[in-house]
């Protein structure tokens, strides 16, 4: 099972003794189309549904709206994971209905996927827990966080000691461009590095950014996470990278004991609104200024000129 969207992975095809199944979010991916034209297998997304294809035959496996891990298809890297898992299960001989049931019942929370883009809320604070420890993982995470409305952002982060200096510094620079407060921890995976050597490399990178104002080196993953949580303010976004999955579970237990709860992506990206009276009746007003490109509301269905109680006004004459 190979990622058709990554040229380096596509090149591994020549080393595969068995049959190859490709996956890609884009149904028009050139590698996927070429592979299908020769009768090969592929998994991709069309109309927000997972498709299993072999040659010209397509099977609609499941809508991403029914796959909790992807948060309705809003988290691209989790969609990739679902495509890869679906392709692997299919190649192993599982029937499509069994694969679909598995995807629909595998949750995005701590119980099924601890440390893999778990979302929490507590006392007005939104928390994202993700275990990614490298440039690629951080880049993908940041692309998803761009949809979050939170203005103030903090992160708890580190890296294993066997990462290259240039990669640690690069992660620091990315963090320095996206977060106001940074909590750097050192814990389990020094792997030959001296104490605080990793944190100092991160600081080099953070200094290249233009956003971070506060940096706190802290010994221990869980200690750093708790410090960040206890000093956060309502309305803030806190990104937490546990040092180990066990730390992630321990953190969730603390959050739960204090009244926190797991939330969905839709809840996490929702903007604060106020309900006010207007000449049209009660109306929702944004609780903050929107930026260009922000999604205000989503709806499905045809655009019509008649106003009904089931329509949303999107222009002066369109509903």
Residues covered by each model-derived region:
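Asparagine-centered polar/low-complexity signal
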Residues: 3, 78-81, 134
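Residue-level signal for inorganic ion chemistry
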Residues: 1, 20, 81, 85, ...
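ATP-dependent carboxylate-amine ligase
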Residues: 64, 75, 87-97, 101-319
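Phosphate-binding loop of NTP-binding sites
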Residues: 2-4, 8-18, 310, 314
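G-domain G4 guanine-recognition motif of GTPases
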Residues: 1-5, 25-26, 185-191
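Extended acidic/charged loop-beta regions that coordinate divalent cations
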Residues: 10-68, 105-120
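Glycine-rich nucleotide phosphate-binding loop and flanking beta-alpha elements
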Residues: 7-10, 29, 190, 246-247
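A short glycine/serine-rich beta->alpha loop
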Residues: 69-76
């Amino acid at each position: 099972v190979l990622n058709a969207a990554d040229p380096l992975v596509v090149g591994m095809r020549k080393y595969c003794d068995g049959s190859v199944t490709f996956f890609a979010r884009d149904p028009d991916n050139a590698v996927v189309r070429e592979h299908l034209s020769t009768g090969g297998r592929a998994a991709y997304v069309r109309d927000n549904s997972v498709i299993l294809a072999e040659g010209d035959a397509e099977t609609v496996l499941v809508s991403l709206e029914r796959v909790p891990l992807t948060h309705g298809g809003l988290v691209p890297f989790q969609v990739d994971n679902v495509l890869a898992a679906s392709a692997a299960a299919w190649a192993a001989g599982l029937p499509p209905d069994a694969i679909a049931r598995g995807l629909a019942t595998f949750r995005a929370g701590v119980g099924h996927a601890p440390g893999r883009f778990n979302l929490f809320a507590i006392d007005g604070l939104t928390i994202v827990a993700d275990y990614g420890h490298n440039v690629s993982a951080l880049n993908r995470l940041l692309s998803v966080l761009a949809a979050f409305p939170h203005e103030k952002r903090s992160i708890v982060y580190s890296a294993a000691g066997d990462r290259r200096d240039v990669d640690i510094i690069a992660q620091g620079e990315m963090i320095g461009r996206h977060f106001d407060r940074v909590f750097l921890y050192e814990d389990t995976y020094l792997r030959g590095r001296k104490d605080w050597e990793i944190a100092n490399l991160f600081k080099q990178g953070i200094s290249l950014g233009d956003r971070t104002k506060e940096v706190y080196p802290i010994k221990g993953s869980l200690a750093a996470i708790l410090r960040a949580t206890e000093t956060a303010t309502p309305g803030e976004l806190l990104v937490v990278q546990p040092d180990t999955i066990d730390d992630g579970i321990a953190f969730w237990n603390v959050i739960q004991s204090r009244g926190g709860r797991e939330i969905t992506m839709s809840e996490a990206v929702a903007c604060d609104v106020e309900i006010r009276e207007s000449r049209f009746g009660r109306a929702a007003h944004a609780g903050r200024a929107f930026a260009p490109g922000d999604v205000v509301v989503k709806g499905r269905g045809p655009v019509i000129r008649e106003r009904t109680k089931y329509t949303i006004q999107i222009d002066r004459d369109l509903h």
